[in-house]
Design a protein with these regions (language model features):
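N-terminal amphipathic/hydrophobic targeting modules at extreme N-termini
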Residues: 1-14, 20-25
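Glycine-rich beta-alpha loop segments
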Residues: 28-42, 46-142
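Amphipathic, Lys/Arg-enriched alpha-helical "gate/interface" segment within cytosolic domains
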Residues: 32-46, 76, 147-159, 166-169, ...
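Short coil/turn connectors at secondary-structure junctions
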Residues: 79-81, 111-113, 135-138, 156, ...
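Fold-independent oxyanion-binding glycine-rich loops
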Residues: 87-89, 119-120, 142-145, 162-165, ...
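Acidic/glycine-enriched connector segments
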Residues: 123-182
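Active-site/ligand-binding-proximal alpha/beta "capping" segment
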Residues: 163-215, 261-263
């Protein structure tokens, strides 16, 4: 008997058996073996798709992460206190958001005396570091290794390049007393929402978040209000972020938070530990 269009199953794959395979079983076996020689998945990311590795592999990975933290902590230990500025790497000099980031960072450095910290790259990051430098303030960056290398901008007094995004985000929060968010893409949204989550869950407290660019973030504001309406966040959570276009209002908001919650002082290096500022 010949079955046209019969399905056979082998492991997790299904095969359509044509008339030749059903009448000649050896052809069916040959077709399965030929298929098994082909990769089931894209081999471009084998590390992430292999699942748990050996104990030695996991230990080496943990040590690499630990070393990244040590490098970052040592490099940035005397950089603070900082205000961290986030935003797109794609805006060029002369763009509205580039110039606004430059202005806000200039005011923070000159009026509040904080170090400006960024991701160390181009665009908004460059503008923020540039504003701090022009104000005579300190300017530092925590860069990230990418497949298409993101070089540090020329306005950094100190920088460190980190391999892992999650290590970098910890460092950007650790030395900061506030975040200023400018328009950006996935990375900027990731940093914004992670910080909002940390504040909402009390992992960090009394941490002002200022979002600059009300036109750009108008859909986000609407979505946050929708979330509050649906009950997935509390109405009070809407107060975690200040949306504004006013540089003076942004600086005043940060100053109010810090004046009422912190005594800020810069750490000094210890000569007996061979530390450098």
């Amino acid at each position: 008997m010949r079955f046209i269009g019969l399905y056979g199953t082998f492991g997790t794959k299904r095969y359509l058996l044509d008339s030749k395979c059903t009448t000649k079983p050896h052809l069916f076996i040959h077709s399965i073996l030929a298929t098994l020689k082909k990769p089931f998945i894209d081999q471009s990311e084998p590390v992430w798709l292999d699942g748990p590795g050996s104990r030695s592999f996991e230990l080496v990975f943990a040590l690499k992460v630990f070393w990244e933290f040590i490098r970052g902590l040592r490099a940035l230990h005397f950089s603070g206190p900082c205000i961290t500025v986030f935003g797109s790497a794609r805006f060029k000099e002369g763009h509205r958001y580039y110039e606004e980031a430059r202005q806000v960072s200039h005011k923070i450095a000159s009026e509040l005396g904080f170090t400006i910290m960024t991701g160390g790259g181009p665009g908004i990051m460059e503008a923020a570091n540039r504003g701090a430098r022009e104000a005579g303030g300190r300017s530092v960056g925590c860069n990230i290794e990418l497949p298409h290398e993101q070089s540090q901008n020329p306005y950094l007094d100190k920088f460190v390049t980190i391999r892992y995004f999650f290590v970098r985000k910890v460092l950007l929060v650790k030395y900061s007393y506030a975040f200023v968010i400018f328009p950006g893409g996935f990375g900027t949204m990731d940093e914004l929402f992670e910080t909002m989550t940390l504040v909402q869950t009390k992992k960090i407290v009394d941490f002002p978040i200022v979002v600059m660019g009300t036109d750009y973030f108008k859909p986000l504001q609407a979505y946050l209000h929708f979330m509050a309406k649906e009950g997935t966040i509390s109405p009070e959570d809407l107060n975690l972020v200040l949306f504004t276009d006013d540089a003076d209002a942004a600086v005043a908001h940060i100053q109010h938070f810090i004046a009422h919650n912190y005594t800020v002082k810069r750490r000094r290096p210890s000569w007996w530990l061979f530390e450098k500022n």
